[in-house]
């Protein structure tokens, strides 16, 4: 999928197992850029070692419940989104909801339309697969991300714990409903 409305042509494609190293690199770099200034180096190092190693990303790519989309410009990976079919927290009213686990753009391109393109593709994919509700967790101190999600129609429905290294943090749980696609049944298609 090629997207207009960003500064350079942007391609969003589903990641494959061959993308594990590329996925690992963009996942860790965007996470560190986003949360490094507000967390200790020790907690950041511990979390990254637990979450972003190439073998971990390869395992996630291999799981049918995960879908990872990479955003690319001129051959460079500049962002990504990860969706996951997982049990939603109790505050999410739809038990068949799909989660946007992560959605990030490279720091030097934040505000250039990459996040917007990834969000649109994520919502489209969720709807195509029969999901009526999308939910996500966002750190309660990440005001920029919360504002972004609110612009996309997400509402705050509760909280959940997030362990970042040794630090116990609180994520806001946000959700939104999706329009039903014509001719779509009431059941969800599992990726």
Language model features: what each stretch is:
Residues 94-98, 132-146, 150-191:
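C-terminal "cap" of GNAT-fold acetyltransferases
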Residues 106-108, 112, 140-141:
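Active-site acidic-Proline motif in GNAT/NAT acetyltransferases
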Residues 9-11:
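Extreme N-terminal starter segment of soluble prokaryotic enzymes
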Residues 14-20, 24-37, 42-108, 116-121, ...:
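Acetyl-CoA-dependent GNAT
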